A protein has these predicted regions:
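SAM/dcSAM-binding transferase cores
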Residues: 248, 455-511
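Solvent-exposed, non-transmembrane alpha-helical starts
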Residues: 272-276, 380, 461
């Protein structure tokens, strides 16, 4: 291998490393958006569009500096390593202390995108320099550059969800990525550009890179303390457990006897009043004959806890996407769910609910007597598909002929369109539906949809052999089916995979 070939290979390797780092910064901000803002389609679109637009802006803004490509490249990579490395910590701290706006994240994305966009013109200029490549064919140079750039992006895209985020978290992961960015700049400066920029400029560049690396090292060391301090400011009660899983940020808080679970910042339950929600969700779907029950979502184990109180229920299949939620249900939340997920009658399946419904494997004879759908609110397209016409059609394949389905459907008062959209979508899927709602102090007015196949809507009833309940009675349930004039039933178009209308209903906000 000639010296020129080695230089070219080393520079292309640096291109791949820088591309990987750039995409990781972008994914870190998208992950942060999901944690702080819910990660809706609008937020994701704004961040991605802002990043892509900034790439073009960076390519234009760097044009006057192409005559000094070597030192400009080192400066850009230094800034990118520092700003990208600090981005997650800075955004998290800003949100925790002063509150945050989506536009702050978009601005951060634009700055990083501008710096990333400047890389390709600079590298193209360096690769065409006689002292660096000796190549005269601009098309071949551009092809090699693009190949290295796209390969690096692939590496970064795979590294973030499977390696960096699970192992390091957002703040430390972004900082380590910044260190890699700085290292790539240092390698290029020492081995490729020293003959171009001169010893004095090289020494200055290395000094700045070293100082930046030391700063990021300090951030890595302090990241746990920074994150725990800033995270605690987002929650009123002391945090007792935290995990950033591959799917979401999970936080458990506790004050006295009140334990609360949050997913991506959204409250899932409070032990102060979750029994109102859980009893209202579970018991109307059971009737007096339900022996096999499918629970989709509900990985906290609270629904399973109530099901196990019914003596005739002999089989519970619990399908939960996130193994981290199951681990917490068996750990810090064990007291809340009475160890339900470790009961031999409960089969825990870690899978996406829709994927599992397509290939559910062995089913109880005749199908499940009851299906309880306890999923987070559909505030993004990933969750929206679990409230779609196609999803409910899959549910019919595993449901017994006379079985009942219950769906947690959000607040009929605060998000009425989303609530009635769920009811209408179930109806379009071939179910006869009875909506009902109860007051849960933590959530406010909260609604459910009880459904069976056919044209005869079920009447919500408390099973005769139900154990003593703290909230639900037949009188409460009868009243729950009545809706006042300011929240009268609506018939809406169904939400589908092609047109997830329910996500737009949620995005429209709370009245």
């Amino acid at each position: 291998m000639t010296g020129t070939t080695r230089w070219r290979a080393l520079l292309l390797a640096a291109v791949a490393a820088c591309a990987a780092c750039g995409l990781i910064y972008e994914l870190a901000l998208l992950t942060l958006s999901a944690s702080l803002h819910g990660g809706g389609i609008v937020a994701t679109s704004l961040i991605v569009a802002g990043y892509v637009a900034a790439l073009g802006a960076g390519a234009l803004l760097v044009k006057p500096l192409l005559g000094h490509a070597a030192i400009t490249f080192i400066a850009v990579e230094t800034l990118l390593g520092v700003i990208g490395g600090l981005s997650a910590a800075a955004m998290y701290v800003a949100f925790s202390f002063i509150g945050g706006s989506l536009w702050v994240l978009v601005l951060g994305t634009a700055v990083i995108g501008t710096l990333v966009g400047a890389e390709v013109p600079l590298l193209m200029t360096l690769l065409q320099r006689g002292r660096t490549t000796g190549a005269a064919d601009a098309g071949r140079v551009l092809a090699n550059l693009n190949a290295a750039d796209y390969l690096g992006a692939l590496i970064g895209g795979l590294a973030w969800p499977f390696l960096v985020l699970p192992a390091l978290g957002m703040i430390r992961g972004a900082a380590v990525t910044g260190m890699i960015n700085l290292a790539a700049a240092a390698v290029v400066a020492v081995f490729l550009l020293r003959s171009i920029i001169g010893r004095r400029q090289l020494a200055s560049a290395l000094a700045v890179l070293t100082a930046a690396a030391l700063g990021l090292t300090a951030l890595i060391v302090a990241s746990d303390g920074i994150q725990s301090t800033t995270r605690q400011r987002l929650y009123a009660d002391p945090i007792i457990a935290y995990q950033q899983s591959a799917y979401q940020e999970i936080v458990v808080t506790r004050r006295g006897t009140d334990t609360r679970l949050y997913l991506d910042g959204g409250l899932q339950f409070s032990t102060r009043d979750e029994y109102r929600y859980t009893e209202s969700l579970v018991y109307p779907a059971l009737g007096d004959e339900a022996r096999s029950v499918l629970v989709l979502g509900g990985g906290d184990g609270l629904a399973a806890r109530e099901l196990l109180r019914m003596p005739q229920v002999g089989q519970i299949v619990q399908v939960e996407l996130d193994p981290a939620v199951i681990a917490l249900a068996r750990g810090p939340l064990r007291g809340a769910n009475a160890g339900a997920l470790d009961d031999p009658r409960v089969q825990v399946v870690v899978d996406d609910a829709m994927i599992w419904l397509r290939e559910p494997g062995a089913l109880p004879e005749g199908g499940f007597d009851a299906v309880i759908i306890d999923l987070p609110d559909p505030d993004n397209p990933v969750l929206g598909r679990l409230y779609s016409l196609e999803f409910y059609a899959l549910v019919t394949r595993v449901l017994a002929v006379d079985g009942l389905v219950v769906v947690q459907s959000g607040s009929p008062f605060s998000t009425p369109n989303a609530f009635w959209r769920t009811v209408s979508t179930l109806g379009s899927a071939g179910f006869a539906v009875t909506p009902y709602h109860v007051h849960v102090p933590t959530f406010g007015d909260w609604g459910f949809a009880l459904a069976r196949r056919g044209t005869s809507a079920p009447t919500p009833t408390v099973p005769e052999d139900a154990p003593p309940l703290r909230f639900l009675t037949q009188q409460v349930l009868d009243a729950a089916t009545v809706f006042p004039p300011d929240n009268a039933p609506q018939v809406l178009e169904p939400s589908t995979l092609d047109n997830p209308r329910i996500v737009e209903d949620m995005r429209a906000g709370y009245r």
